[in-house]
């Protein structure tokens, strides 16, 4: 039975609080509204899980990926397609048209709060999903109004690092087959080699710079082919490094939010193919996540849902990331 969201909240008079030296008027909730977060490193299946949950509960999705907020480069940024979204409304996905300016954590905080409020007003559950942990931290840790108004449940989709790296490599090859290079070629600006801001930071854009310049300069075919192969390998390498950094950040956040973070291990899904993979997904990821969300939505505010005891995997030191990639991982 789907929980009735109207019954989950009761608003009474605003409350004035002193927050960092300033008096802030905030709504006081006897029962807070509830927000679900789906976290995980790149490639682990966050979008799939968010959509699965949104088809089981009355929910809408708010994107928290700092590159997917921009319009364009749908292959490079691996946005969900209309077919994959299964009709579930998505917010902050491809909505920023100024692709040369950074969409900061403060920008996300402001727009995400608006999206969450609009979703809650329609008696639906906001599911915030994406890999930009600085966005989530800005919303949960740095915004007093958000903390006072909402209870949060965090789902962490995890995959064994060697298995994830193998999958990421395969995914990059598929993205190339789908037209990644042509997509980057269309936005390539030979007058600029600055990839420090906006959508140009996306992994897959700076790595192709040298190859695209070689095309324009009519280098020999064998040279351009070699540069393309090098660029693709660099895309794979940087994506794996990004995944490691994201995992490190999630482990740090887990220590802060341990009481209501639920880790689901999707490794088995990536070791299987076809129907077996779908079955493993349902059993290992979708079903336990749905149970956690159902309990979270059903319990009153004074019940703390304990996340499962998590034995955190050891993460070895990660080599320094290129500046643009490091910016994405924050």
Curated annotation (Swiss-Prot):
Gene Ontology MF: a single term: AMP dimethylallyltransferase activity
EC number: 2.5.1.112
Induction field: Down-regulated by cytokinins and up-regulated by auxin. Not induced by nitrate.
Keyword tags: ATP-binding, Chloroplast, Cytokinin biosynthesis, Nucleotide-binding, Plastid, Transferase, Transit peptide
GO-annotated cellular components: chloroplast; plastid
Annotated binding of ATP, by residue: 40-47
Uppermost EC category: transferase
Range of the transit peptide: 1-39
Tissues/organs with expression: Expressed in root primordia, columella root caps, upper part of young inflorescences, and fruit abscission zones.
KW Transferase (keyword) present: yes
GO biological process per UniProt: cytokinin biosynthetic process; tRNA processing
Main localization of the protein described in the UniProt heading: plastid
KO phenotype (gene knockout): No visible phenotype, due the redundancy with other IPTs.
Catalytic activities: dimethylallyl diphosphate + ADP = N(6)-(dimethylallyl)adenosine 5'-diphosphate + diphosphate; dimethylallyl diphosphate + ATP = N(6)-(dimethylallyl)adenosine 5'-triphosphate + diphosphate
Compartment list: Plastid, Chloroplast
Gene3D superfamilies, per the entry: Crystal structure of tRNA isopentenylpyrophosphate transferase (bh2366) domain, P-loop containing nucleotide triphosphate hydrolases
Functional description taken from the UniProt entry: Involved in cytokinin biosynthesis. Catalyzes the transfer of an isopentenyl group from dimethylallyl diphosphate (DMAPP) to ATP and ADP.
Family label: Belongs to the IPP transferase family.
Annotated protein name in UniProt: Adenylate isopentenyltransferase 5, chloroplastic
